Amino acid sequence: MEQGKGLAGLFLVISLLQGTMAQQKEEKHLVKVDDSQGDGSVLLTCDFNEKTITWLKDGHRISPPNATKSTWNLGNGAKDPRGMYQCRGAKKKSQLLQVYYRLCENCIELNMGTVSGFIFAEIISIFFLAVGVYFIAGQDGVRQSRASDKQTLLQNEQVYQPLKDREYEQYSRLQGNQVRKK
């Protein structure tokens, strides 16, 4: 059992060392993306100190030959400038950079002001709902009964009113289908 733990620990140490070695060998990013332009355009910037820079998209050259611009305008971000971009000089080339824009037409940018506005609106709506329920529910319990609200249906507080004899009204017959004698 101890030998298995030691082997697992050795495997963990080796994998961590390989990760740090790969990170040290990694080149710095030579192509940078700038999408904070006022007109919504996306710019790629290549950090080469060379005279001629060639821009590639998906392995095909997109810049004119012998171009000297270290920046490349991809156009508006709404036009979806997707692809694998790379800049190449006379002596070296950059790593591939994948540009992928996912546009959302019905999205809301959630910053601190938007979230606090939602919370404030929710608190205000709950307050008005609670006040409305309080005033509607509180009206019935506070009202006192008045003498004019009470109607006297039967005289002298009788429980039942006797039926009058020989009247053919709706409630004068109590025995169903039998007809009363006249």
Swiss-Prot record:
Domain Ig-like: 37-94
Transmembrane parts of this sequence: 117-137
Extracellular side: 23-116
Keywords for this protein: Adaptive immunity, Cell membrane, Disulfide bond, Glycoprotein, Immunity, Immunoglobulin domain, Membrane, Phosphoprotein, Receptor, Signal, Transmembrane, Transmembrane helix
Disulfide bonds: 46-87
UniProt keyword annotation of Glycoprotein present: yes
Post-translational modification summary for this protein: Phosphorylated on Tyr residues after T-cell receptor triggering by LCK in association with CD4/CD8. Phosphorylated also by PKC; leading to the TCR complex down-regulation. Phosphorylated on Tyr residues after T-cell receptor triggering by LCK in association with CD4/CD8.
Spans within the Cytoplasmic topological domain: 138-182
Keyword Cell wall biogenesis/degradation: no
Membrane topology designation: Single-pass type I membrane protein
Motif Di-leucine motif positions after renumbering to this chain: 153-154
GO cellular component, one term: alpha-beta T cell receptor complex
Any single Pfam family the record assigns to this protein: ITAM
Major localization listed first in the record, in broad terms: membrane
Protein role: Part of the TCR-CD3 complex present on T-lymphocyte cell surface that plays an essential role in adaptive immune response. When antigen presenting cells (APCs) activate T-cell receptor (TCR), TCR-mediated signals are transmitted across the cell membrane by the CD3 chains CD3D, CD3E, CD3G and CD3Z. All CD3 chains contain immunoreceptor tyrosine-based activation motifs (ITAMs) in their cytoplasmic domain. Upon TCR engagement, these motifs become phosphorylated by Src family protein tyrosine kinases LCK and FYN, resulting in the activation of downstream signaling pathways.
Record comment regarding domains: A di-leucine motif and a tyrosine-based motif are individually sufficient to induce both endocytosis and delivery to lysosomes.
PANTHER family registered for this protein in UniProt: T-CELL SURFACE GLYCOPROTEIN CD3 GAMMA CHAIN (PTHR10570:SF8), T-CELL SURFACE GLYCOPROTEIN CD3 GAMMA CHAIN / DELTA CHAIN (PTHR10570)
Name of the protein described by the UniProt record: T-cell surface glycoprotein CD3 gamma chain
Organism of this sequence: Rattus norvegicus (Rat)
